[in-house]
């Protein structure tokens, strides 16, 4: 059974509310700005963002508050593959701790389920305990380590979550 639909952008909603929608090419500058503010290393360039926005094997969600992108999540798929990958999730510094990451995570999980994926996997920096707590709270389990995975030598912790319950 699929999760309830994630509400997408609602122009009638109250000011200050967070809206979620799929990103478009019109979000390119805001995505690059969020990326540069959120990550010290391994930032995606405008060219990479454009390629992902145009790709059939990627889906990008943005969280919007008062017409401003305050969060984004990038999900990758492979044809006829039942495992999706959360490539990136970022929330603006002033918006962290307000549930934006959880909203974005719910959207990518729902999208992966709709595409028939059974598992969602991700890597997270070993020095990012806040993100690790979010993933663990949402049912992800750690299943591996990639030493020196990031450009600056930091390790990556590998997490995954079953999206479709096992049938007995």
Regions found by a protein language model. Give the residues of each.
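Acetyl-CoA-dependent GNAT
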Residues: 2-94, 102-107, 111-115, 162-166
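Short aromatic/hydrophobic contact patches that present stacked aromatics
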Residues: 88-90, 121-123, 158-160
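Conserved beta-strand-loop-alpha-helix junction that forms the acyl-donor binding cleft
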Residues: 93-96, 122-132, 148-153
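Glycine-rich phosphate-binding loop
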Residues: 99
């Amino acid at each position: 059974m699929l999760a309830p639909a994630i509400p997408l952008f609602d122009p009638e909603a109250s000011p200050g509310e967070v809206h979620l929608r799929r990103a478009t090419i019109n979000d390119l500058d805001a995505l690059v700005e969020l990326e540069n503010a959120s990550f010290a290393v391994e930032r995606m360039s405008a060219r990479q963002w454009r390629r992902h926005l145009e790709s059939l094997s990627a889906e990008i969600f943005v969280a919007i508050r008062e017409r401003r992108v305050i969060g984004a999540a990038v999900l990758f798929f492979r044809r006829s593959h039942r495992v999706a990958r959360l490539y990136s999730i970022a929330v603006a510094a002033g918006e962290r701790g307000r549930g934006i990451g959880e909203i974005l995570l719910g959207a990518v999980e729902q999208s992966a389920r709709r595409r028939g994926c059974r598992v969602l996997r991700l890597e997270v920096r070993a020095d990012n305990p806040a993100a690790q707590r979010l993933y663990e709270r949402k049912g992800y389990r750690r299943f591996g380590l990639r030493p020196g995975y990031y450009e600056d030598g930091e390790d990556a912790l590998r997490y995954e979550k079953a999206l479709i319950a096992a049938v007995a």
